[in-house]
C-alpha cells in the first residue's frame, strides 16, 4: 500500500476515529503505533463489530480492541514470500516492520496479486 500512513492510529484514538480511518483508508485495516512508530497492533472491521457487540462506546480507546500480536514481516522480505505467507495464513494485509519493530509499510493482498 503506497500511503499506509493514512491508516495509522495511536493507542489513545477513539473507536469513532478508528471507524473513520478504516472507512477513509479503504483497505479494511488500521495500524496502531506509538509515538516512535513502533507497531502496537492492528484493527479490522471485525474488531469494531465485536467492540460494539460488547457495548464499548465510541469514545473507548482503540487499544482496548486492537490485536496486540499481529503477524508481521521484516522489511527485507520479498513480495513473493509475503504473498505466500499471506496465502498460508489467510490474510488480506501484512504490516511491514524493520529490525527494531518500527512500522515501515503495509502490504495488501490486492496490491500483491
PLM region descriptions:
Residues 1-113:
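Tandem CBS (Cystathionine beta-synthase) repeat/Bateman regulatory domains
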Amino acid at each position: 500500500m503506497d500511503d499506509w500512513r493514512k491508516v495509522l492510529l495511536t493507542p489513545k484514538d477513539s473507536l469513532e476515529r478508528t471507524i473513520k480511518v478504516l472507512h477513509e483508508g479503504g483497505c479494511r485495516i488500521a495500524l496502531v503505533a506509538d509515538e516512535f512508530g513502533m507497531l502496537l497492533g492492528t484493527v479490522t472491521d471485525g474488531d469494531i463489530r465485536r467492540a460494539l457487540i460488547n457495548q464499548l462506546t465510541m469514545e473507548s480507546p482503540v487499544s482496548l480492541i486492537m490485536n496486540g500480536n499481529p503477524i508481521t514481516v521484516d522489511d527485507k522480505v520479498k513480495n513473493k514470500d509475503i504473498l505466500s505467507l499471506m496465502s498460508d495464513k489467510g490474510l488480506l494485509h501484512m504490516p511491514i516492520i524493520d529490525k527494531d519493530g518500527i512500522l515501515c509499510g503495509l502490504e495488501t493482498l490486492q496490491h500483491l496479486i
